[in-house]
């Protein structure tokens, strides 16, 4: 994923995602038509119809009075609602989250301040976390919301906040994959709404089970049990991707071929905690399938100097630290050999602790303090060429190049380069000569190293 982002940034084309075009949203039912159809079929009540239809009309009216960024953001959310209606995606269970999103955007963009990219906000009287996705409005940040709930649980003295947050989010789940899922209602990195995530759903499992263990509230256990559906179901409805070893749980339901490790590992942490608390044999089976796959692939994400984000490229600093934390959590659970034996199951049905998660987490922690290894590979270059200098680099780093002829600096360049044998641009002089080259590599954690060498440029 990072490799894709670097390439996109180089071309200046990376965006969160575009709103559905009016043409794309005009082939199926309109929003008002879809709501009316649900009402006439008795799928929704008069009260629900009136609330959602009124909210939709209010948002369209507000849009007409806005301009600039505010109009763009609210317009994108409206376009997403219209596109889902046209695609037949306005099912009854999806309406609460979808129209809450529309109303919160109408409220924010008519009365609130402009927001920075990825800025998070909340509303008075609510514990739900929202995030600004530029060009897509503000959207419910499910991972952050369930993470907030985990924080309330772990503090031990914020039970009222924990209850409020869970009581807010449970009614916002959508019927999906034979169970329920907390869906994202916006375009993101090629994904079209509505989509879901093994990462956020795994965190939901974890905190719902924890809350049930504390409060014995049946609704929390029921929601957690129903949330297992996406882990049993293949994309695009679910996130389960079968593998020779077991299964991997996709971070994005729309991108089953992306093997993003941090989201997968956190989904396993959530499944482990859910199963340890509830003793549910289905949870055990789902964890076992994912655990078998994780033990097979985790070593492949360790380059020896840094972590891989997915099968395509290295992690940025935030994701490296996040993956390390998730691996530490899984290490703590499996190293202790905590049995996950449901009532009535054979005594041997448990997780066998080993060191894969632990040693990898330790190595990733050490990587945060280890300088990159860099070497100059090019020794001779043709004059008047743009081929650049070839380097050897152990991990993703910001690399700076200085070229001197005698005491005179004749060329400088810098770039963020991934590991391997990348090239750094140097347009060599046509007249040739001998040049001193110095390179400095600074990794994403701030560790740096330098190297120097001599390059002979030959005449064309």
Please place each PLM-identified region on the residue numbering:
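Short proline/glycine-enriched turn/loop motifs at strand-loop junctions of beta-rich domains
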Residues: 392-398
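Well-ordered alpha-helical segments within folded domains of soluble proteins
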Residues: 75-85, 96, 138-154, 195-212, ...
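Structural beta-strand segments of beta-rich domains
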Residues: 385-389
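Glycine-centered tight-turn motifs at strand-turn-strand junctions
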Residues: 409-433
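Carbohydrate-binding/catalytic loop surfaces
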Residues: 117-136, 179-197, 241-262, 302-326
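Structural helix-adjacent loops and short alpha-helical linkers that scaffold large soluble proteins
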Residues: 27-28, 46-51, 61-75, 82-95, ...
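Long, well-ordered core segments of solenoidal/helical folds
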Residues: 103-135, 159-182, 218-243, 281-306, ...
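Low-complexity, Ser/Thr/Pro/Gly-enriched N-terminal "stalk/linker" regions
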Residues: 26-141, 154-184, 301
């Amino acid at each position: 994923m990072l490799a894709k982002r670097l390439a996109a940034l180089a071309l200046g084309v990376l965006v969160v995602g575009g709103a559905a075009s009016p043409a794309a949203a005009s082939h199926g039912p309109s929003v008002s038509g879809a709501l009316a159809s649900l009402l006439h079929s008795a799928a929704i009540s008069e009260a629900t119809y009136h609330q959602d239809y009124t909210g939709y009309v209010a948002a369209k009216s507000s849009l007409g009075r806005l301009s600039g960024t505010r109009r763009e953001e609210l317009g994108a959310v409206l376009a997403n609602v219209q596109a889902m209606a046209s695609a037949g995606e306005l099912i009854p269970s999806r309406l609460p989250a979808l129209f809450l999103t529309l109303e919160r955007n109408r409220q924010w963009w008519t009365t609130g301040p402009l927001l920075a990219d990825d800025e998070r906000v909340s509303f008075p009287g609510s514990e739900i976390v929202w995030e600004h996705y530029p060009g897509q409005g503000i959207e419910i940040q499910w991972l952050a919301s369930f993470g907030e709930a985990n924080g309330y649980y772990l503090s031990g003295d914020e039970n009222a906040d924990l209850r409020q947050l869970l009581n807010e989010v449970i009614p916002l789940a959508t019927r999906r994959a034979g169970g329920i899922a907390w869906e994202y209602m916006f375009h993101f990195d090629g994904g079209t709404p509505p989509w879901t995530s093994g990462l956020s759903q795994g965190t939901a499992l974890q905190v719902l089970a924890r809350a049930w263990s504390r409060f014995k509230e049946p609704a929390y256990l029921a929601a957690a049990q129903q949330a297992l559906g996406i882990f049993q179901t293949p994309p695009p409805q679910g996130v389960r991707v079968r593998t020779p070893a077991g299964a991997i749980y996709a971070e994005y339901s729309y991108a089953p071929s992306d093997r993003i490790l941090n989201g997968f590992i956190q989904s396993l942490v959530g499944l482990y905690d859910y199963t340890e608390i509830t003793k549910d044999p289905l949870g055990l089976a789902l964890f076992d399938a994912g655990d078998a796959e994780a033990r097979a692939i985790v070593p492949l994400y360790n380059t020896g100097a840094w972590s891989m984000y997915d099968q395509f490229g290295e992690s940025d600093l935030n994701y490296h630290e996040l993956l390390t934390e998730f691996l530490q959590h899984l290490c703590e659970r499996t190293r202790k050999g905590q049995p996950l034996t449901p009532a009535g199951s054979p005594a041997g049905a448990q997780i066998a602790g080993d060191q894969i998660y632990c040693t990898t987490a330790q190595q990733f922690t050490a990587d945060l303090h280890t300088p990159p290894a860099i070497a100059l590979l090019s020794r001779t270059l043709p004059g008047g060429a743009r081929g650049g200098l070839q380097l050897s680099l152990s991990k993703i780093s910001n690399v700076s190049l200085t070229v001197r002829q005698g005491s005179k600096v004749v060329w400088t360049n810098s770039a963020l380069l991934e590991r391997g044998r990348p090239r750094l641009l140097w347009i060599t002089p046509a007249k040739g000569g001998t040049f001193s080259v110095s390179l400095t590599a600074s990794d994403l954690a701030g560790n740096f190293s330098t190297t120097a060498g001599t390059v002979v440029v030959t005449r064309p």
